[in-house]
């Protein structure tokens, strides 16, 4: 909450409202705050609407993808929020569900869709349709799994033998066998593969850079933009994009804008509030072990954008 500064009052947009913890804290910070909470998971949205009902019209729930924030504000006749927050990744409601397929702790259909009501492909659908090379590529790219080719080979071999992977247990067991035993395993061998499939199914990295630009453009002058990410791929994008909007040319990431040379669209529109990502301390990790990999980055929109030539 420190970086959002909700005590100032105004409109805040919680782009991934989940169970509403952040939204509740924003609403409690000042009687002058309002929150629009966005989520593509209708179950989470319904639970949050009930949880925050006592705030009345100060909270409004919208069933949509966080990347639709510009359209939502336009439809509602709202403009220039004081703050925008995006807490990326899987919510506790999704991860703890025994039926949604996000976790290998439960034997469930291999779904992984954040919006189970959508017509999008499930994780099982992807593994049934994609060729071996594409499965290996997505597991390596999104999961940074060094055994991606071997895992993909085993998945396709099982499919060709008339045994397609359709449940979380089947996938977790196959990955454990394919990866083989290694000493000092600190995480389950299927963790990276599950992450990769979830990212692919929900297209989590697609247009993330464009979302940053949209959010910054929507903010009022001095408005705050805060993003919490949970894996290195997201955090890398957030770091690069915030630096680009702070005027650091990504053509040469060490330099400020050189107007005649820059082709990456760098501009000085924000002040970065977090020189390094903010990570949870040991007390917070003990209270919430899932926060261990969280990284928070924040920026403040400048009152006047500084041109490339200045």
In which residue ranges do the predicted regions lie?
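S-adenosyl-L-methionine-dependent methyltransferase catalytic core, i.e., the SAM/SAH-binding region
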Residues: 1-310
């Amino acid at each position: 909450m420190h970086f959002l500064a909700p005590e100032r009052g105004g409109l805040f947009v919680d782009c991934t409202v989940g169970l509403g913890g952040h939204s509740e804290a924003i609403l409690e910070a000042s009687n002058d705050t309002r929150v629009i909470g966005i989520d593509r998971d209708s179950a989470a949205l319904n639970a949050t609407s009930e949880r925050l009902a006592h705030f009345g019209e100060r909270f409004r729930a919208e069933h949509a993808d966080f990347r639709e924030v510009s359209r939502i504000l336009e439809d509602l006749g709202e403009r220039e929020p004081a703050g925008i927050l995006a807490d990326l990744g899987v919510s506790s409601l999704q991860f703890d569900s025994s039926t949604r397929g996000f976790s290998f702790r439960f034997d469930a259909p291999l779904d992984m869709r954040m919006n189970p009501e959508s017509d999008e492909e499930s994780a099982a659908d992807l593994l049934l349709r994609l060729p071996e090379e594409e499965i290996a590529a997505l597991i390596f790219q999104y999961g940074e799994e060094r055994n991606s080719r071997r895992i993909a080979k085993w998945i396709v071999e099982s499919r060709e033998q008339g045994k397609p992977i359709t449940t979380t247990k089947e996938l977790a067991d196959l990955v454990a066998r394919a990866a083989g035993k290694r000493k000092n395993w600190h995480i389950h061998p299927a963790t990276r593969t599950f992450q990769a499939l979830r990212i692919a199914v929900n297209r989590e990295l697609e247009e993330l850079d464009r979302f940053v630009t949209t959010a910054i453009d929507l903010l009022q002058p001095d408005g705050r933009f805060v993003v919490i990410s949970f894996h290195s791929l997201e955090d890398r994008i957030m770091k690069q994009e915030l630096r680009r909007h702070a005027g650091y040319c990504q053509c040469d990431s060490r330099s400020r804008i050189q107007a005649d040379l820059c082709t990456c669209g760098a501009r000085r529109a924000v002040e970065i509030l977090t020189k390094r990502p903010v990570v949870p301390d040991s007390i917070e990790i003990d209270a919430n072990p899932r926060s261990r990999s969280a990284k928070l980055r924040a920026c403040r929109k400048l009152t006047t954008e500084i041109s490339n030539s200045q």
